[in-house]
């Protein structure tokens, strides 16, 4: 090459290089923007927990940074999801007088937006007879589905949802099938490979040439997201909204993937499944485009782009249209709040009793505890009840004896920091030398029984053996079927003891391990301070967890303790009782200024929320005088249980005139009935959370609708306990409240449908309604509706705190999540002092104007 040619080549290279670099830089920027939009969409999805650890979750949790009405508009336009109560439900409340003219007038006065819009009571009443004018933005799949030339028996949207859902079910299953897919390359790669071998999907969707399009799919999820989003030609400003709308078409599986991400973050890790699910759902739209001609594609792009150009305007229009729905939401809440305010003021004036307290009983804050606490206090003035989060402040995971089935026993917001295991502990100290040998024997016995059971059940999971298994084992299942058809009076079963020799079950006790004495003392001090039990302890202190009892119920964990991650509170109560009864721990507490009298004994117990019976644990460890007091309590428990069962009987369609024994028998049979879809109502009806001394709610009937947490501001000079209550239990109760709210307002999209049609997916992932569709999240219809009427009223939580205003404001200012909840209308916040109630509204307090209607 000549010198001139070399110089010319260098000049050309120098000229070309800047443009090449700019093109690459522009492409990198585009890819970054796409990744950011995908991440933003993924962050909008709230998690859902597996069936065996089911806890209630606000499905809009990731959107609380926006006002409720804005979220309602987004959900309607992007996902066809209803956030406020349906207008027919509100019309019924108005017609029946549940919402009064005074409630409506007070609401219009309370909402500045309603005043600015000039809404009158007449306007609001008229609006109840029509649906809000809302326009749903289409996705690419919707545009293609509307093509008049499409000839299939099933809409493409339905077919795609079914295919994606079945793929996810196979991929995530770890408990149901003995064969598991290869997961090392991720969900997207598994879906792509599955699709390549699915020769029936083309026939189902009327796309005989889809195989060629599948082969052209990008290899990675990131490339698929870029490939699709670049082709759609949508304005960048709406990318995240479009992608969120895509995820809402498979919201159930998106929520499951969000749970995997949530758990990974608790362990300081990352999880990519939600992004891969988004890529799968996006890629399906592009696949359909590959199967159509260019003219049809061009028309689809034009239609989609025109619709999404107006997305911001449609969202604003929806927000305006839903103002009336927000008015009726508040009016429904004010109708309840009037009665609540009157009760709280009257209770605050009641003088405390003078009888000496012989027993203190700490219950979970769960709304089902409130009627029983009230009944116990009525039955015997010598008992004082307390409200505390049902995990009793123990940040633990529990592993039953001879298993590796480690499970969290604390709120889903937290990660376990300590471990609880089972050990054989004899009651008599002189027998404890033999405990190690008994434990070894128990472990061997249990492992043997598990092995036999697993081999037996495996026969039903291999395809070739399924029918022969049914023929061979059919008669063996008649016993269980008989128990369901003719339910007996069996007590609540304890799965953690399954397979253990009966003679060892009573001395198999859960306890903390790996915790030094100083750490034990610190933990005990924190728990007692949180309960307000730092002085004047009674001779007996009950730690009463709670658990439900039902048969053949995939959602049984949802009726147990949410603070224990869908488990009963037994493990936490028993572990804490053992800890607080340790002499060395008590000595250490003395040094911290917490004097636990030597005669005080802590006793673990469990409230069966289905039958309202109380069961005690480790009673053989109690001294004689405590055993005598426990026997005295049995009559108190029976009397209180009778009262609560009679209160509950009308809502369960039981005979309220039946004898006490007959009512208890009916509830026990109900708890063992495998055909019973409504063993109890769980937390249906929940509407308030009261953080105050028990005196504030003592003696008043709160109808099992209030969470109750004891709190004495005079003992919390630095506000640290209040901060903990507003950032942990308040968030948990908010989650519960909004899951019930969401499942009532949109049972189709945010509820799990009909229990009678449920099929469990992957052993514990969730349920399908029938054999397909999206994974269903939320509560079943039978958990909210009695067949004629809704049992749950969709009210946002009213939080009532008896503490200095400055202390409450300090927590709000310090914690963004709390500020978002109160400022964006996700809950109501009241301050109570003496006989005065005040309402918090964006940094200001105003007198609660709730005159009786």
Curated annotation (Swiss-Prot):
It holds the Pfam family DabA. Residues 7-21 have a biased composition (Polar residues). One of its GO terms (molecular function) is zinc ion binding. Keywords: Cell inner membrane, Cell membrane, Membrane, Metal-binding, Transport, Zinc. Zn(2+) binds at residues 364, 366, 546, 561. Its cofactor is Zn(2+). Residues 1-21 are annotated as: Disordered. It comes from the Bacteria. It is a peripheral membrane protein. Belongs to the inorganic carbon transporter (TC 9.A.2) DabA family. Part of an energy-coupled inorganic carbon pump. Forms a complex with DabB. This is Probable inorganic carbon transporter subunit DabA.
């Amino acid at each position: 090459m000549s010198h001139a040619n070399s110089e010319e080549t260098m000049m050309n290279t120098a000229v070309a290089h800047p443009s090449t670099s700019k093109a690459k830089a522009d492409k990198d920027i585009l890819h970054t923007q796409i990744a950011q939009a995908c991440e933003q969409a993924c962050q909008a999805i709230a998690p859902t927990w597996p069936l065996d650890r089911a806890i209630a979750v606000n499905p809009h949790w990731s959107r609380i940074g926006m006002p409720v009405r804005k979220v309602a508009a987004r959900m309607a336009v992007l996902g066809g999801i209803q956030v406020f109560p349906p207008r027919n439900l509100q019309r019924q409340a108005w017609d029946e007088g549940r919402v009064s003219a005074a409630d409506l007038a007070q609401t219009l006065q309370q909402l500045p937006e309603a005043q600015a819009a000039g809404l009158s009571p007449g306007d609001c009443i008229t609006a109840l007879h029509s649906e809000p004018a809302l326009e749903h933005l289409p996705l690419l799949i919707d545009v293609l589905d509307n093509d008049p030339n499409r000839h299939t028996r099933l809409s493409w949207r339905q077919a795609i949802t079914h295919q994606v859902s079945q793929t996810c079910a196979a991929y995530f299953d770890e408990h149901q099938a003995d064969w598991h897919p290869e997961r090392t390359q991720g969900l997207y790669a598994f879906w792509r490979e599955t699709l390549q071998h699915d020769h029936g999907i083309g026939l189902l969707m009327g796309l005989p040439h889809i195989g060629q399009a599948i082969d052209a799919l990008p290899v990675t999820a990131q490339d698929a997201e870029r490939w699709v989003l670049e082709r759609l030609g949508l304005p960048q400003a709406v990318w995240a909204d479009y992608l969120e709308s895509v995820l809402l078409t498979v919201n159930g599986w998106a929520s499951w993937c969000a749970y995997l991400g949530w758990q990974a973050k608790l362990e300081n890790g990352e999880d990519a499944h939600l992004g891969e699910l988004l890529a799968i759902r996006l890629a399906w739209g592009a696949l359909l485009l590959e199967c159509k001609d260019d003219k049809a594609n061009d028309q689809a792009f034009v239609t989609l782009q025109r619709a999404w150009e107006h997305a911001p305007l449609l969202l604003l229009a929806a927000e305006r249209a839903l103002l009336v729905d927000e008015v009726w939401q508040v009016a429904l809440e004010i109708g309840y709040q009037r009665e609540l305010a009157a009760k709280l003021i009257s209770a605050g004036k009641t003088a405390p009793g003078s009888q000496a307290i012989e027993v203190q009983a700490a219950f979970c804050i769960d709304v089902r505890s409130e009627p029983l606490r009230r009944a116990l206090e009525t039955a015997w003035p010598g008992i004082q009840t307390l409200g505390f989060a049902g995990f009793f402040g123990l940040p633990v995971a529990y592993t039953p004896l001879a298993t590796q089935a480690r499970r969290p026993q604390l709120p889903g917001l937290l990660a376990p920091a300590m471990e609880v295991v089972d050990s054989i502990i004899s009651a008599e100290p002189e027998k404890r030398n033999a405990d190690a040998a008994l434990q070894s024997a128990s472990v061997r016995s249990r492992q043997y029984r598990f092995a036999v059971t697993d081999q037996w059940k495996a026969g039903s999971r291999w395809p070739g053996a399924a029918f022969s298994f049914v023929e061979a084992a059919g008669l063996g299942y008649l016993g269980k079927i008989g128990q369901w058809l003719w339910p007996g009076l069996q007590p609540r079963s304890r799965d953690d003891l399954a397979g253990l020799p009966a003679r060892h079950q009573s001395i198999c006790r859960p306890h903390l391990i790996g915790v030094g004495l100083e750490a034990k003392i610190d933990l005990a001090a924190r728990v007692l301070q949180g309960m307000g039990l730092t002085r004047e302890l009674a001779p007996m202190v009950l730690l009463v967890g709670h658990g439900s009892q039902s048969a053949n119920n995939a959602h049984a964990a949802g009726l147990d303790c949410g603070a224990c991650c869908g488990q009963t509170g037994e493990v936490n109560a028993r572990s804490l009782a053992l800890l607080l009864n340790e002499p060395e721990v008590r000595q250490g507490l003395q040094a911290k200024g917490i004097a636990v009298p030597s005669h005080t004994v802590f006793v673990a117990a469990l409230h069966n929320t289905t039958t309202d019976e109380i069961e005690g644990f480790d009673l053989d460890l109690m001294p004689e005088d405590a055993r005598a007091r426990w026997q005295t309590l049995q009559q108190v428990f029976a009397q209180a249980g009778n009262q609560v069962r009679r209160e509950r009987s009308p809502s369960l369609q039981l005979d309220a005139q039946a004898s006490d024994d007959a009512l208890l028998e009916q509830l026990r049979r109900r708890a063992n009935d495998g055909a019973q879809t409504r063993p109890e109502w769980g937390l249906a009806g929940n509407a308030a959370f009261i953080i105050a001394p028990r005196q504030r709610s003592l003696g008043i009937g709160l109808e099992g609708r209030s969470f109750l947490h004891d709190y004495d501001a005079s003992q919390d000079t630095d506000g640290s306990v209040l901060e903990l209550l507003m950032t942990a239990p308040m968030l948990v109760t908010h989650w519960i409240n909004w899951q019930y709210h969401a499942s009532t307002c949109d049972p189709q999209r945010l509820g799990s449908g009909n229990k009678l049609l449920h099929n469990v997916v992957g052993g514990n992932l969730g349920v399908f309604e029938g054999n397909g569709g999206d994974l269903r999240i939320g509560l079943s219809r039978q958990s909210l509706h009695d067949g004629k009427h809704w049992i749950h009223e969709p009210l946002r939580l009213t939080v009532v705190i008896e503490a200095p205003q400055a202390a409450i404001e300090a927590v709000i200012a310090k914690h963004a999540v709390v500020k978002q909840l109160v400022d964006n209308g996700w809950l109501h916040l009241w301050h109570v002092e003496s006989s005065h109630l005040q309402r918090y509204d964006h940094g200001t307090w105003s007198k609660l104007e709730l005159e009786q209607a």
